């Protein structure tokens, strides 16, 4: 761009009146956008590094499992340092339940509902996201409750948290055996 073009395009009313300032929220948003736009290989590299820094060993799991788990997280967090807390449940069998959520989601009335959901998952012909979503919705309808009434206790039982990747996709990645064990453990402990 020549000096003449710059002078022609310059417009004083477009200049901000206040001083420049650091905007932490915008930085977090920008970091999230950056992570979302990364190529799969670079995303995987940075994610595995974040888990390693948090002393979570992803190397003891098959590569296809680690990549499938990380794919469920893409676009769901802002900083890679958040990833171990967000998705660490994929890489451990020891699930710590959020105490406050456990009081709410593992209420006595939810135990028989979670048992019915466990039975529906066990009977599912395929253990993929679409089949599991249909099984959950059918179970909710049969129980006369909204799907969310089953989603929250199920997510807590399987991940220990109230938020995270898509429930149906994370169930598929974890696999039938792990999901059944985790739901059974939650039913036994609460």
Predicted regions span which residues?
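Catalytic adenosine-cofactor/nucleotide-binding cores of aminoacyl-tRNA synthetases and other
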Residues: 1-100, 104, 159-190
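C-terminal accessory/binding modules appended to enzymatic or scaffolding proteins
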Residues: 102-158
């Amino acid at each position: 761009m020549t000096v003449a073009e710059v002078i022609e395009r310059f417009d004083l009313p477009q200049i901000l009146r206040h001083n420049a300032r650091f905007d932490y929220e915008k930085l977090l948003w920008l970091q999230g956008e950056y992570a979302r736009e990364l190529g799969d290989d670079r995303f995987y590299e940075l994610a595995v590094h974040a888990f390693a820094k948090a002393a979570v060993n992803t190397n003891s799991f098959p590569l296809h499992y680690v990549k499938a788990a990380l794919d469920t997280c893409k676009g769901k967090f802002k900083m890679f340092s958040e990833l171990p807390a967000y998705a660490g449940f994929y890489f451990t069998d020891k699930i710590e339940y959020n105490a406050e959520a456990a009081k709410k989601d593992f209420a006595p009335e939810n135990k028989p509902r979670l048992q019915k959901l466990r039975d529906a998952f066990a009977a599912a012909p395929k253990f993929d996201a679409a089949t599991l979503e249909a099984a959950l919705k059918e179970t909710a309808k049969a129980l006369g409750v909204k799907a969310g009434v089953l989603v929250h206790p199920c997510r807590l039982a399987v991940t220990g948290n109230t938020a995270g990747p898509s429930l149906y996709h994370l169930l598929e990645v974890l696999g039938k055996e792990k999901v059944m064990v985790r739901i059974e453990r939650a039913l036994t402990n609460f």
